[in-house]
């Protein structure tokens, strides 16, 4: 079956292609009475949309969302919420030369083998254009989570070889890179300018954090919260790796270093990333995403055509030299969708559970 829906109680279904007339989403399971407006959704869409700086694709899409159903007089009704974003700046002719060729490291080859045909215009369904609907749906989840005291936000923690230390959340929304260190922005800009001159691309690392999450979210064994987050975050285009907490750094740690010891005042560390045994611990939930460099570059690359003949591919069109630059709001959206789904699932099963043990924060 097609994998176009995520969630159990709070579900998000998307449809649409990069060069189709529109993108759509159906969001189901949102409790009634939640105050929601177009501005709530548009804020995150504007953070993600293309053409916002010289360091991203110059495709000009306003990404103005329309709410078709499920909201009446500014509040959710409890019925399915229909969302629509119209595509307005397609240039399909840019792709006519490669309609019978497979771009290296793209989904062209695998979509062709799976379905027997493919929409070659901008990648069709495999394009990251689809993630606009995830961001719109995620904005609804964020709004609901905020009523429960939960905040989800992210930042870029590495661009290519440049590591970006966390300094302040205030900086994240003040630059095109979502950098938490304002002093790094000139270096990032210079690196991206040189990358464009080299006609190349680069990967990135995004960190996303959820604060205020209560203990208890997650459904062992197969729907562990960390497993669900990894699933959701890995579904984002170009993501090739996900870490929870210390992640792969845990390999080099000893148990005395890695274990998050507890005191009456709180946890002494958070190597687990806020999840123990697949269940949220009450600490901040921390995930890191590795995004590959896009292979949509003008440097020629070797490939084959649909008949298996060797060819050289040069990708035209408008592309992000670093897809990670616009990935922060997408990662936030997917984490918010997972957390809302699990909060509703936890409430359904365990609403009557009362525990006298205090909820610990992190020192």
From Swiss-Prot:
It holds the Pfam family Chorismate_synt. Reduced FMN (FMNH(2)). GO terms for molecular function: chorismate synthase activity; FMN binding. FMN binds at residues 125-127, 237-238, 277, 292-296, 318. This is Chorismate synthase. Keywords: Amino-acid biosynthesis, Aromatic amino acid biosynthesis, FAD, Flavoprotein, FMN, Lyase, NADP. InterPro entries: Chorismate_synth, Chorismate_synth_AroC_sf, Chorismate_synthase_CS. Its cofactor is FMNH2. GO terms for biological process: amino acid biosynthetic process; aromatic amino acid family biosynthetic process; chorismate biosynthetic process. Belongs to the chorismate synthase family. NADP(+) binds at residues 48, 54. Pathway: Metabolic intermediate biosynthesis; chorismate biosynthesis; chorismate from D-erythrose 4-phosphate and phosphoenolpyruvate: step 7/7. Homotetramer. One of its GO terms (cellular component) is cytosol. Transmembrane segments: none annotated. This reaction introduces a second double bond into the aromatic ring system. SUPFAM superfamilies: Chorismate synthase, AroC. It comes from the Bacteria. Its EC number is 4.2.3.5. It catalyses: 5-O-(1-carboxyvinyl)-3-phosphoshikimate = chorismate + phosphate.
């Amino acid at each position: 079956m097609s994998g176009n829906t995520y969630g159990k109680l709070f579900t998000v279904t998307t449809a649409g292609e990069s060069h189709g007339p529109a993108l759509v989403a159906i969001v189901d399971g949102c409790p009634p009475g939640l105050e929601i407006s177009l501005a709530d959704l548009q804020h995150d869409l504007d953070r993600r949309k293309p053409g916002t700086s010289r360091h991203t694709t110059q495709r000009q899409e306003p990404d103005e969302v329309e709410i078709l159903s499920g909201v009446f007089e500014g509040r959710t009704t409890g019925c399915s919420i229909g969302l629509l974003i119209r595509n307005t700046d397609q240039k399909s002719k840019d792709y006519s030369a490669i309609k019978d060729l497979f771009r290296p490291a793209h989904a062209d080859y695998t979509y062709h083998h799976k379905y027997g045909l493919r929409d070659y215009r901008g990648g069709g369904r495999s394009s990251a254009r689809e993630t606009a609907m995830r961001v719109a749906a995620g904005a609804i989840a964020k709004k609901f989570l905020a009523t429960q005291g939960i905040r989800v936000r992210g930042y870029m923690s590495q661009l290519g070889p440049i590591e970006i230390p966390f300094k302040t959340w205030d900086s994240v929304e003040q630059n095109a890179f979502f950098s938490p260190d304002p002093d790094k922005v000139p270096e990032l800009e210079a690196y991206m300018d040189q990358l464009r001159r080299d006609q190349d691309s680069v990967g990135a690392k995004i960190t996303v954090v959820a604060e205020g999450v209560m203990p208890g979210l997650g459904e062992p064994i197969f729907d562990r919260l960390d497993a669900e987050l990894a699933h959701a975050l890995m579904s984002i285009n170009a993501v090739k790796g996900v870490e929870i907490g210390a992640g792969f750094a845990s390999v080099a740690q000893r148990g005395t270093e890695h274990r998050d010891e507890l005191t009456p005042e709180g946890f002494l560390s958070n190597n687990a990333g806020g999840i123990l045994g697949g269940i949220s611990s009450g600490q901040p939930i921390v995930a890191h995403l590795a995004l590959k460099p896009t292979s949509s570059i003008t440097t020629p690359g070797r490939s084959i055509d649909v008949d298996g003949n060797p060819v050289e591919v040069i990708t035209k069109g408008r592309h992000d030299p670093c897809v990670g630059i616009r990935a922060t709001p997408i990662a936030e959206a997917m984490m918010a969708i997972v957390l809302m789904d699990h909060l509703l699932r936890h409430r359904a099963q365990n609403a009557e559970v009362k525990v006298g043990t205090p909820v610990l924060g992190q020192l």
